[in-house]
From Swiss-Prot:
MF GO annotations: flavin adenine dinucleotide binding
Claim: NAD is one of the keywords in the record: yes
Originating species: Onion yellows phytoplasma (strain OY-M)
Reported function: NAD-binding protein involved in the addition of a carboxymethylaminomethyl (cmnm) group at the wobble position (U34) of certain tRNAs, forming tRNA-cmnm(5)s(2)U34.
Similarity section: Belongs to the MnmG family.
Protein's gene: mnmG
Protein name: tRNA uridine 5-carboxymethylaminomethyl modification enzyme MnmG
Cofactor: FAD
Length: 617
């Protein structure tokens, strides 16, 4: 039997890829452990700045992460709610036992999808085209396309102090064959590191020495299709390290796997270990530690901010210095994990490899960190593998269309030498890439690709129509200077009116919000629809400016660079630019502008060359 596609690895990337492919194709999902499908080994949360928006983008394109997160969340909060809409995002505490179970049940019910527990030893490749896989027991399985989503399980090692153990997270076996094979085929393999903090017993914490952190009372969800989850929100708690903590860490610094020279891999810049924080930010007297629930079914709390690779006895010593954790009982020790990954500049924007046809890479093995970054790559790899099977062109999101587009373009164009984390600051057009409008940006694509069902799409069309109706009414609704309106504005602590105005003009006042729309229009509509109308009116000028800038970028993206161009032939192009352009092989002039080592002079020279030799190329 020949499968249309094989997905290797059932983490967050593999799950999204397999579910997308199975909508149209016969798909095999291979995992080292069916008990660890979509597991949360690093932290029990989904979302955060930029990442929460990605979860909504995944949902708008037909992915599953948002729906499962809504069902499994035990606390949810809108971050940056007091700031502008460009930086708002949801973050949820997730029940680490319930979430994988929800995903596993979805996989089991999915038609065209076969689940197989096993380890892949190597790929079957002929004439630079993948043909299938071989398992470690010698079984050969043929497929037309293959997606590798092995996360942190390639040649992985667990490190605690000076001890090393060959293993993936949660005791799942590591694998070496794929990494070795791709290295032999000329792929650049990079060594990366991440880590996780200790877990402690709930009832061993003195919560009176901590500050409680509650979720939002208002109902918040990731998915645009509401899921039922009526349970109460679980609290988190905040404590801090102190100078005594830092003295303990400094005293034992050379015993850390990181500072003792036992780690080869590069760690994440934006999620450093506690020993890294103490060394890098030595002027700070304390660091935050969030105490978070891992599951309603576990007597265990996660200590966010205390990731470390210190020996076990030092971990105990560290906890004894932290308020509320002096008597905490460790249920699972912190550790670092290093693993093989692949520099993503070896991929096309479709996430297909440049060297091997029909082979796609997605997730943490592409040098990213985070469940959300992995899931969106799996989704896009699944979509593009499906399109390849249908002989259709790839689907590539632009930087002004989605954070997913920003992430993939950054990876392909700039590569990765350390774990890449998506940040709002990485997006030039973050006012366009908001939490609230992910469906307005992407759901049409999802429907066109056959990933959104008719009922969902009809509901979306009705939502769009309602938004447009309220926008039009707001622009035409006249606010007269009368006692009722003046009294209302006074109640809202807003300036009086000197002459009549429109509701849209009135709403541009910073102290007024969607409640003003509801007060005057009296239209029946969800709060989210009113909020969308408010944002589009209040930030109209800024949004128009961002759209104008995006159009400028689009013009550069339309200038294609022939694949057969020889950069060595271009006179006056710097040596570094020649090397970088030849390595990345940008498809457009816009992409070339974002390559590190290619400056504006190089771009001007390249543009002149392309215009002069266009007919010959």
């Amino acid at each position: 039997m020949i499968y249309d596609s094989i997905v290797i690895g059932a983490g967050h990337a593999g799950v999204e890829a397999a579910l997308i492919l199975a909508k149209k194709h016969n798909t095999l999902l291979i995992t080292g452990s069916l008990k660890q499908v979509a597991s949360l080994p690093c932290n029990p949360s989904i979302g955060g700045p930029a990442k929460g928006v990605v979860v909504r983008e995944i949902d708008a394109l037909g992915g599953v992460m948002a729906k499962a997160a809504d069902l499994a969340q035990i606390q949810i909060k809108m971050l940056n709610s007091s700031k502008g809409p460009a930086v708002r995002a949801l973050r949820a505490q997730i029940d680490k036992l319930e979430y994988p179970q929800i995903i596993f049940e979805i996989l089991q019910k999915t038609l065209n999808l076969t689940l197989l527990e096993g380890l892949v030893n190597n790929l079957v490749i002929q004439n630079n085209q993948v043909q299938g896989v071989c398992l470690i027991d010698g079984t050969k399985i043929n497929a037309k396309t293959v997606i590798i989503t092995t996360g942190t399980y390639l040649a992985s090692q667990i490190l605690i102090g000076d001890t090393k153990k060959s293993s993936g997270p949660n005791g799942v076996p590591t694998t070496y064959g794929i990494s070795t094979q791709l290295k032999e085929l000329g792929f650049e393999v990079i060594r990366l590191k991440t880590g996780t903090p200790p877990r402690v017993k709930k009832n061993s914490i003195d919560y009176s020495q901590t500050k409680i952190q509650m979720g939002d009372n208002l109902e918040q969800i990731f998915s645009f299709v509401p899921q039922t989850n009526q349970r109460p929100q679980e609290p988190c708690f905040l404590t801090h390290t102190n100078q005594t903590t830092h003295q303990v860490i400094q005293k034992h610094l050379n015993q850390s796997a990181m500072y003792g020279g036992y780690v080869e891999g590069t760690g994440p810049r934006y999620c450093p270990s506690i020993e890294d924080k103490v060394v890098r930010f030595c002027d700070k007297n304390s660091h935050q530690i969030f105490i978070e629930p891992e599951s309603l079914s576990l007597d265990e709390m996660y200590l966010q901010g205390l990731s470390t690779s210190m020996p076990q006895h030092v971990q105990h010593e560290i906890l004894k210095t932290i308020p509320g954790l002096q008597n905490a009982q460790i249920t699972k020790y912190a550790y670092a994990i290093e693993y093989d990954a692949f520099n993503p500049n070896q991929l096309k924007h479709s996430l297909e490899t440049k060297k091997i046809q029909n082979l796609f890479l997605a997730g943490q093995m592409n040098g990213t960190s985070g469940y959300e970054e992995a899931a969106c790559q799996g989704l896009m790899a699944g979509i593009n593998a499906s399109l390849k099977l249908q002989n259709k062109p790839p689907f590539v999101l632009k930087r002004n269309e989605a954070y997913i587009g920003v992430l993939i373009d950054d990876l392909i164009t700039k590569g990765a030498k350390e774990p890449y984390r998506l940040l709002t600051s990485r997006a030039e057009f973050r006012l366009l890439l908001r939490h609230d409008n992910a469906d307005l940006r992407l759901k049409d694509y999802g429907y066109q690709l056959g990933l959104i069902d008719e009922k969902d799409y009809n509901n979306f069309q009705n939502k769009k129509a309602k938004i447009n109706l309220l926008l039009e009414k707001s622009k035409n609704y006249e606010i007269l200077v009368n006692s009722d309106n003046l009294s209302y504005l006074k109640q809202q602590k807003s300036a009086s009116l000197g002459e009549k105005t429109t509701l849209a003009q009135l709403l541009k006042r910073p102290e007024l919000n969607f409640c003003t729309l509801q007060h005057f229009l009296q239209e029946k509509a969800d709060k989210t629809i009113y909020e969308q109308v408010e944002i589009q009116i209040k930030y109209e000028g800024y949004i128009a400016k961002a759209q104008k800038e995006a159009q400028k970028l689009a013009r550069l993206e339309q200038k294609k660079i022939p694949s057969k161009i020889n950069y060595a032939d271009i006179k006056n192009l710097s040596k570094e630019a020649q090397e970088k352009l030849d390595l990345i092989k940008p498809q457009t002039l816009g992409q070339a502008t974002r390559i590190l080592g290619v400056n504006q002079v190089d771009i001007s020279i390249l543009l002149v060359y392309l215009e002069k030799h266009h007919a010959l190329l």
